[in-house]
Amino acid sequence: MLKYPDYLSKLISFLRKLPGIGFKTAEKLAFELLDWEQDQLEALGKAFSELSIARSHCPCCFCLKNFPESQCEFCQNNRDTSTLCIVASPKDIFSLERSQVFKGHYYVLGTLLSPLTGKHIEEERMRLLKQRIEFLNPKEIILALDATLEGDATALFLKQELAYSLASISRLALGLPIGLSFDYIDSGTLARAFSGRNPY
């Protein structure tokens, strides 16, 4: 029976926990790492250690921030307060920033609603979102959510929850394929989606 050394089996096992990584890919990556120089492996190990120690979220928008700074770079910078873009994950913010079409503020929900699995948005996160809207007083709230059932459910929920606001609510439309996650959308497509957003 095939049996790898314990250190290699453990590495393959951890790599398989990453989304989209099956056994074959994890095995290939593990053997690739075996060929790395000692200093490269130590640098990688240091990066993982820093990730576990320094990872933190901005108290204003819940994007990732550098430790020990009090806010993320987007909340620190002098950005347009007339627009607030709501996303599901911090990685969505970086996708939108690469498209270079949005200059306003962000807010991260942390998840999308999923009626099938019972996943919901935390009450505290919604309370802080409303607080953020009150503070910024934006003219437009943009729902930059995945074009999936979960994204649709979340957009409908937010439209109802934020109906009290005087801000107009829009959602990205043009260029976002149905059923596709933000992870697979290029910056050009995102730019078109932003330009062609519709009232929601």
Swiss-Prot record:
<dbReference type="Pfam" id="PF13662">
    <property type="entry name" value="Toprim_4"/>
</dbReference>
<comment type="similarity">
    <text>Belongs to the RecR family.</text>
</comment>
<dbReference type="Pfam" id="PF21176">
    <property type="entry name" value="RecR_HhH"/>
</dbReference>
<keyword id="KW-0234">DNA repair</keyword>
<keyword id="KW-0479">Metal-binding</keyword>
<dbReference type="GO" id="GO:0008270">
    <property type="term" value="F:zinc ion binding"/>
</dbReference>
<dbReference type="InterPro" id="IPR000093">
    <property type="entry name" value="DNA_Rcmb_RecR"/>
</dbReference>
<keyword id="KW-0863">Zinc-finger</keyword>
<dbReference type="GO" id="GO:0006281">
    <property type="term" value="P:DNA repair"/>
</dbReference>
<dbReference type="InterPro" id="IPR006171">
    <property type="entry name" value="TOPRIM_dom"/>
</dbReference>
<feature type="zinc finger region" description="C4-type">
    <location>
        <begin position="58"/>
        <end position="75"/>
    </location>
</feature>
<keyword id="KW-0227">DNA damage</keyword>
<comment type="function">
    <text>May play a role in DNA repair. It seems to be involved in an RecBC-independent recombinational process of DNA repair. It may act with RecF and RecO.</text>
</comment>
<dbReference type="GO" id="GO:0003677">
    <property type="term" value="F:DNA binding"/>
</dbReference>
<dbReference type="Pfam" id="PF21175">
    <property type="entry name" value="RecR_C"/>
</dbReference>
<keyword id="KW-0862">Zinc</keyword>
<protein>
    <recommendedName>
        <fullName>Recombination protein RecR</fullName>
    </recommendedName>
</protein>
<dbReference type="InterPro" id="IPR034137">
    <property type="entry name" value="TOPRIM_RecR"/>
</dbReference>
<dbReference type="InterPro" id="IPR023627">
    <property type="entry name" value="Rcmb_RecR"/>
</dbReference>
<keyword id="KW-0233">DNA recombination</keyword>
<feature type="domain" description="Toprim">
    <location>
        <begin position="82"/>
        <end position="177"/>
    </location>
</feature>
<dbReference type="GO" id="GO:0006310">
    <property type="term" value="P:DNA recombination"/>
</dbReference>
